[in-house]
């Protein structure tokens, strides 16, 4: 008889959240290495700092990259080896609040400004935050929220055993 390995509940959502986080981290790495593509969607100050090529900016981008990769992978890796650590889940829930809050506000505010005519998607920074960066934060947060919610029952069952 062949044993089949089943995935812990929430695994597809954890994978989706990790992918969204890594997609958000990739441009930070690219910019850290000196790239300019899509930087105008972040803002003119980011473009100016990148053109100046200051070493502290590179270190800041490295820190942002490491934080995003850590935030993307640690909850997923912790989920795969039960029981999940309580501190990882607590920090992940805080991350969910930040990601959904920041991403939701940015997405909603961007669309609200475009719909009311206060801003135009012709401006790279408005388009970038309305179409790309904020929705990606929101998606990352929603996927992680779903993963943590679905996996909570498993955590309770493992703790009770």
Task: Write out the residue ranges for each language-model feature.
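Cytoplasmic juxtamembrane regions at transmembrane-helix boundaries
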Residues: 2-10, 74-97, 154-161
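Short, membrane-exposed interhelical loops at transmembrane-helix boundaries
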Residues: 44-47, 115-129
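Membrane-water interface at the C-terminal end of transmembrane alpha helices
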Residues: 135-155
């Amino acid at each position: 008889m062949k044993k089949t390995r089943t995935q812990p509940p929430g695994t597809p959502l954890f994978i989706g959240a990790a992918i969204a986080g890594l997609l958000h981290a990739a441009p930070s790495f690219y910019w850290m290495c000196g790239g300019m593509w899509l930087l105008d969607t972040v803002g003119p100050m980011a473009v100016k700092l990148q053109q100046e090529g200051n070493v502290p900016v590179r270190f800041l981008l490295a820190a942002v990259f490491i934080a995003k990769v850590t935030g993307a992978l640690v909850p997923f890796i912790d989920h795969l080896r039960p029981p999940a650590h309580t501190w990882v889940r607590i920090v992940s829930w805080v991350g969910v609040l930040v990601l959904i809050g920041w991403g939701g506000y940015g997405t909603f505010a961007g669309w609200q400004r475009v719909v009311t005519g206060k801003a135009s998607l012709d401006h790279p920074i408005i388009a970038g935050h309305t179409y790309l960066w904020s929705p990606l934060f929101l998606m990352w947060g929603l996927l992680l929220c779903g993963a943590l919610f679905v996996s909570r029952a498993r955590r309770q069952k493992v703790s009770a055993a």
